[in-house]
A protein has these predicted regions:
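N-terminal, post-signal-peptide region of Sec/Tat-exported proteins
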Residues: 47-94
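Gram-negative (and chloroplast) outer-membrane scaffold detector with strong preference
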Residues: 32-39, 77-170, 178-182, 186-187, ...
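Intrinsic low-complexity/disordered segments
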Residues: 15-19, 31, 228
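Solvent-exposed loop segments that connect transmembrane elements
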Residues: 42-66, 137-163, 198-223
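Short N-terminal segments immediately surrounding and downstream of signal-peptide cleavage
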Residues: 21-37
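Cleavable N-terminal export/targeting peptides
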Residues: 1-26
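C-terminal beta-signal and adjacent terminal beta-strands/loops
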Residues: 183-190, 194-207
Length: 240
């Protein structure tokens, strides 16, 4: 997809000198694609267990789910310029890496505004775009069929089936654009993707502490919380 857009930009740049009659204000639509990175987690949970001992009270140990990880991805964007400096836009991204403890693959959709100042060869903007982020394996609340699990705490992750979970997101940040020609642009984004997590259950890796080195994967409840996650992208686009 990005190769196709890049090819279109190249040919449009070659022919741009023959289309000077069309003003920038008449180029209302923008389409493009981007590579993006999102530094996020699937919520944070912890479990506390009692370690075996001969004489009570026995000591306890707390294990916590994994923190933030940087996820590479790609996506597409479309915009409509209400004025030269104010744009309505929609963007979708897909992060294909499937990590067992990171909520699986992630997809993102954002819809909002971009406002700032566009100059002859560059533009600087702020953006505000609400939307959502979907984790393909974001919740471990559904019991796995056909598996009889003993009622122990913390419950083993093998007793549950991973299901998708969608959370509200809000993208706040800045945009810098460079215009190789009147029709084409190169875009750089940086911002804070705010994710509002609802309560859900996530896997936690624990060491039983027996000295055997055998790790166990259990399930813990991640409470409702709001997290701040850096997201950056670089992309290309065409105006028409």
């Amino acid at each position: 997809m990005l190769f196709t857009i890049a090819s279109a930009i190249f040919f449009l740049s070659l022919n741009d000198g023959h289309a000077q009659a069309q003003t920038d204000e008449s180029r209302r639509f923008e389409v493009g694609g981007q590579f993006s990175v999102l530094n996020a987690s699937n919520g944070r949970a912890s479990v506390t267990r009692v370690l075996p001992c001969l004489v009570p009270p026995c000591p306890t140990a707390t294990s916590t789910s994994e923190g933030h990880e940087t996820e590479p991805g790609f996506g597409a964007r479309i915009g409509y310029n209400l004025t030269k400096d104010f744009t309505l836009e929609a963007e979708g991204n897909f992060f294909p890496r499937e990590r067992e403890f990171g909520g699986g693959r992630k997809s993102q959709a954002l819809f909002g505004v971009k406002a700032g100042k566009r100059f002859e060869q560059a533009g600087v903007f702020a953006k505000a775009r609400p939307g959502f982020v979907r984790f393909s394996e974001g919740d471990l609340s559904r019991p796995r069929p056909g598996i009889a699990c003993i009622a122990v705490f913390p419950p083993p992750a093998a007793c549950f089936e991973a299901t998708p979970k969608t959370h509200f997101a809000f993208d706040l940040g800045g945009v810098f654009e460079y215009y190789p020609s009147r029709r084409t642009l190169i875009r750089f984004d940086a911002g804070d993707t705010i994710i509002r997590f609802g309560e859900h259950r996530v896997p936690i890796v624990i060491d039983p502490g027996s000295g055997s080195g055998v790790r166990q994967v259990v399930v813990g409840t991640a409470p409702s919380e709001t997290t701040h996650n850096f997201q950056g992208s670089i992309g290309i686009g065409v105006r028409f």
